[in-house]
Curated annotation (Swiss-Prot):
This is Proline--tRNA ligase. The keyword S-adenosyl-L-methionine does not apply. HAMAP family: Pro_tRNA_synth_type1 (MF_01569). Catalyzes the attachment of proline to tRNA(Pro) in a two-step reaction: proline is first activated by ATP to form Pro-AMP and then transferred to the acceptor end of tRNA(Pro). As ProRS can inadvertently accommodate and process non-cognate amino acids such as alanine and cysteine, to avoid such errors it has two additional distinct editing activities against alanine. One activity is designated as 'pretransfer' editing and involves the tRNA(Pro)-independent hydrolysis of activated Ala-AMP. Pfam families: HGTP_anticodon, tRNA-synt_2b, tRNA_edit. It catalyses: tRNA(Pro) + L-proline + ATP = L-prolyl-tRNA(Pro) + AMP + diphosphate. One of its GO terms (biological process) is prolyl-tRNA aminoacylation. The gene is proS.
Amino acid sequence: MRWSNFYIPTLKEAPADAEVVSHKLLIRAGMIRKLTSGIYIYLPLGLRSIEKAASIVRQEMNSAGAQELLMPMVQPADLWQESGRWDFYGKELLRISDRHGRDYCLGPTHEEVITDLVRGEVRSYRQLPLNLYQIQTKFRDEIRPRFGLMRGREFMMKDAYSFDRDAQGLDLSYRAMYEAYMKIFSRMGLKFRAVEADSGSIGGSFSHEFMVLAETGEDTIAFCHDCDYSANVERAEVVCTLDECDAPVAGVEEVHTPDRHTVEEVCEFMNVPAAALIKTLLYVADGEPVAALVRGDRELNEAKLKNLLRADTLELASPEQVREWTGAPVGFAGPVGLGVKRLFADNELRLATDWITGANKADTHLRHVSLKRDTRLSGYADLRMITDKDPCPRCSGTLELTRGIEVGHVFKLGTKYSEAMGCKFLDENGKEQVMLMGCYGIGVSRVVAACIEQNSDENGIVFPPPIAPFEVLLLNLDGKNDDVNARVDELYGAVQAAGCDVLMDDRNERPGVKFKDADLIGVPMQLVVGGKGLARGIVEAKDRRTGEKTELPVDGFAQAFAAWRRQVLQGWGL
């Protein structure tokens, strides 16, 4: 492919609304253009990267026994009403009506459609297991779309759905997809981790996220160096290693704390550390009030609380609700005498008996509170966020926190959708059984953005070879010289013969412009050809990742190039 015939509208500056590195570079490199909020046009260069990522996904899915199909993006409302998600999914679900007044939605995911398909086609245990997948456009009406392809409203996704007869079969399907994902992201040349995760709005009993490691990631991951434990902080288990404290404590005392609403203000006023306080956090779970207690220097993990309650919805109580339930403004809630039936405490609060809490009274706190003596707890549970250096729940090591970008997610759905929608089969005895499901997603367009967040520098993108739009960029620095042009054409053919897709920069531009654009678009291997180099019988090869330059001989170029290319690929761990 010649640059002069290929549409690559590079820019010197990124638009003002581009915040993260990938958004800026995707636009500057001429890979995407914004159509409207959260919706982008994939330009030829960007589409090549996305299609390369999709090709790797497709190959590994097929190798794992999944079969490709394509489902409609527009889905009828009645299927979502049948599963119970029409009302539950919220405003992220873009709802539309046709001319006959029938309700539809633009698919953010396809559990309902695939379940409807399979329940109408699969009747016997002999037809199971079954794994079907698609690579297709999705739409989620994000309230604040941002970061380009990282959090857009329209995006390209691979979603697969497995159907099994029993839990053992589901385990096998899940493991096959997990291993396929490990191969997919390894083949892409990405640094990533598979982490235990919360199932979120999809539902189900067990899941893993696949995280591309990047300092700019929105997610925090906890992992152990001494074993293979990794988890999203929403899922990460907190281990209490000390024994429960049962020390005697003095009677409860009121302390006047005027206008001291926050933990920091109360600590300063009472001259105590934050670890001496209990925070009482009030929520509405499926329409009912609930209170959660954590130590003053900890953060509540809302996902853990929601899972503990088995709630579909969990929202922080409004200031009006706080006043109604406590008789006090926000900042003075406490567990003693609290008029909320469900009251849960984090496990860590077992380790002490003498606490400072809100008094459910304006400008007042309590000291010497014993949860066992002074409150009616519903129970203890792991409710807090993991922190750096917490004990590992699997071994004697400690946990470290890092940042990541979610690019894949696998779920064990169980019977969440098949039960609700009557997706059943007949077993060997002719008895009707509910199918067990799994679902497995990869953000195909997002993985390109995540790759750039992980692999870029001050000059531009640094693509891993497997998902680079082109593997090799051949720069002709002397396009007016017929001898140079002829040699460049020969080298172009030699690189193609080596099995590489190559872009030839044949533009009538200054070398400096070509070098800047070469680094910007991130092609991993650059070959620089000019009259001076050819006079010496060499071609300059540059590894975009390291910046290292190597002189390759024109005579015997094919062999020298093959050896250098192997070196570059090894540097990527490929």
